[in-house]
Amino acid sequence: NINGISETTKEFWRVKEKKSPHNVATSTEKILEIANDKGYRTTSSSESVLNYVTEEVDLENGTVADTVTIPYSQSNVVKWEYNSETKRYTRYSRNKKQTDWTTGEDVTAKNIIIEFIANSTLNDGENKGRQTMNTTGTKDGYYITNGKSIPIKCEKVSRSAKTVYKDLSDKCVENIKK
């Protein structure tokens, strides 16, 4: 129940350099203010959804992945380009380098996980073309880091469960070391 339409303009604002409707911005601080005002919990006793890979990983048997292209749709294709000096991927969308709206820095990632999931158009009577995605069960995917990729299995037993990412020898991705 927090959204940029019903809240006031002090919590959400439009970035004039971007095209509407995808130009509404906010901050973590503003979201927390709204959550506190509405009496929402802002802490959790659940463990983190992701176990981040913090050590350097060498996928020695991996496939070269200097450029990773992800077609979300015909008009929305994301590309990640690997920089061997920084050991990070830079994100491009619609053939333009993406930058942080506040800092102007390139959007980058050390690790990329791609998960192939089934999606379909919702039959909700409104015919808005909204999509539903099946994120539970075992799915195929890729773990990408340091210019290489390996196939993985993505396992999620329920909607509220944490997704577990494993290589094809059943080893959790966060346990793959140099």
Regions found by a protein language model. Give the residues of each.
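A surface/extracellular/periplasmic glyco- and lipid-processing/surface-interacting theme
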Residues: 1-178
